[in-house]
Amino acid sequence: MASFLSFLLGEKKQTASVAKERLQIILAHERTGRSHKPDYLPALQRDLIAVIAKYIHINPNDIKLHLERQDNLDVLEVKIELPDAK
């Protein structure tokens, strides 16, 4: 009977550790799976164009947003090509 209980208890620990490993794999995959653009980037680009257009005439295609992951950080790079001063 004791071996049967230890077998059952041992299975629970093993099952728990397997579930924990699977959860860690899923979380790691979700953290690194941010290769696609977030939903807010197009709206952010439109807002930037609207704000900059209040002050200078700018072509909307001259604003570029790029999101990349560096180590554990998401880095948003904004490039704005300003017109030459006249």
Curated annotation (Swiss-Prot):
The keyword DNA repair does not apply. GO terms for biological process: cell division; regulation of division septum assembly. Pfam families: MinE. It comes from the Bacteria. Keywords: Cell cycle, Cell division. Prevents the cell division inhibition by proteins MinC and MinD at internal division sites while permitting inhibition at polar sites. This ensures cell division at the proper site by restricting the formation of a division septum at the midpoint of the long axis of the cell. HAMAP family: MinE. Belongs to the MinE family. This is Cell division topological specificity factor. The gene is minE.
